[in-house]
Amino acid sequence: SHVSLRHHPDVMNEPYTFAAIYVKGVENGAKVLEGQVPTWKLFGPAQSGLGRGDKTYGLPRFEEAVFQTRFPFATIDLRDKDMPLAAKITGWSPFIPTDADNSSLPVGVLEYQFTNTSDKAIETVFSYNTKNFIDGQGTIRGVKNGFVLESDQNNSGLAIYVDNAAAVVDHCWFRGAWFDPQTVVWDNIRYGRIADKQPVKGVAPGASVYVPLTLQ
């Protein structure tokens, strides 16, 4: 997904940030909440010969994705034969006709809706995960039910939080070399582990927020 901050339309910017869902007791039951990556993205860019560990392209995603837009809303419906649930994402930002100030608030909302398509209750874990792409050598601050990526050098910041009291936050991914942080995070997701780590002093490679859910 393209991410732009501070009014800079960086439409080719794809930082390592994604939402995922895990379903307990289901083979291949962990998926990024996105559709398939177009094959043209996989070849040619810088460092693609090293496997593109800076991208999420290699993580499993939903087989089917249907996109619709009705400004200021956009919706994506996700389905996959491996998953006993359907997912719907609704994205929007404030838009009030004739109210320029409130329509310009630096806020974006992603609403995730899950529907149990099986005949029994299922236990799941939703997560939102991101590398510290604001400042790779910076810290990550905590907020209620979320975290804040920020940088003193360029006066930038990004807060991510969920509206759910059951949220658990991992404020600091595993601090290792190469792609160790990403590997550990994906292992947490695919095994249904919920990491609970408080903010730390010093470098924090990334952060995650987890929400356990039971779907009837």
Q: Whereabouts are the PLM-identified features?
A:
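Extended, loop-rich substrate-binding clefts of extracytoplasmic carbohydrate-active enzymes
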Residues: 43-107, 174-211
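Eukaryote-specific, cytoplasm-facing alpha-helical/coiled-coil scaffolding segments in long proteins
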Residues: 18-19, 48, 136-138
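Beta-strand-rich N-terminal accessory domains
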Residues: 1-44, 66
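Short Pro-Gly-centered flexible turn/kink motifs
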Residues: 122-124, 206-216
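Polysaccharide-binding surfaces and accessory modules of carbohydrate-active proteins
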Residues: 89, 94-188
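A short, compositionally biased
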Residues: 14-17, 68-74, 141-145
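Short acidic, glycine-rich loop/turn motifs
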Residues: 25-27, 78-83, 151
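Exposed beta-strand and adjacent loop surfaces of beta-rich binding modules
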Residues: 2, 18, 84-86, 121-123, ...
